[in-house]
Amino acid sequence: MLVLVIGDFHIPDRAPKLSEKFRQLLIPGKISQIICLGNLTSTSVYEYLKHVCSDLKLVKGAFDISSKAPIAGKITLGSFKIGYTNGHLVVPQDSPEALSILAREMDADILLFGGTHKFAAYELDGCFFVNPGSATGAPNVSAVEDDEKIVPSFVLMDVQGAVLILYVYRIFDGEVRVEKMQYRKPE
């Protein structure tokens, strides 16, 4: 089962559109579920995601003002309990310790979070944390590292029992690069 984890679009206020290179990869019928971590900021992005896959889980981002979406959600895939949130209410934002507390509160084996616009994947305290980054490469206005360029990215998760295979898609110098990672649930 392939699950697309994507977010932080900020279309049209910070980015004009999703890259055509990414659009060519996101083919309807190939993805079983989408988990969107918010900050769509336009209904056209929501409609596009629903076109790619009708099974769309969505949480509200800091800039989704009219969204009725929840701020967090939880699903089970294989043997994993997966929590997901935009991350804008985590204080301090992107703090591994604060995210670890949230994962424990959600009783999650995997915590998906957004908000920083930068891809991240790491294990801490028996939980695996994944931030898919910004799908459009939209700048993060609250980031301290203003000169750091945001790389457009998203991830595909393939859950096989107690193993998560993560495919990280990023655009570098106009070309899509894919990195494969694996996480095994501790016994």
Swiss-Prot record:
Record keywords: Cytoplasm, Nucleus, Protein transport, Transport
Entries under CDD domains matching the protein: MPP_Vps29 (cd07394)
Keyword field contains NADP: no
GO cellular component, one term: retromer complex
Example of a GO biological process term: intracellular protein transport
Annotated signal sequence range: none
Protein localization: Cytoplasm; Nucleus
Keyword match Metal-binding: no
PANTHER family: VACUOLAR SORTING PROTEIN VPS29
The protein's assembly and partners: Component of the retromer complex which consists of vps29, vps6, vps35, vps5 and vps17. Component of a retromer subcomplex consisting of vps29, vps26 and vps35.
Similarity remark: Belongs to the VPS29 family.
Family annotation (NCBIfam families): yfcE
General function of this protein: Plays a role in vesicular protein sorting. Required for the endosome-to-Golgi retrieval of the vacuolar protein sorting receptor pep1/vps10. Component of the membrane-associated retromer complex which is essential in endosome-to-Golgi retrograde transport. The vps29-vps26-vps35 subcomplex may be involved in cargo selection.
Name recorded for this polypeptide: Vacuolar protein sorting-associated protein 29
Source organism: Schizosaccharomyces pombe (strain 972 / ATCC 24843) (Fission yeast)
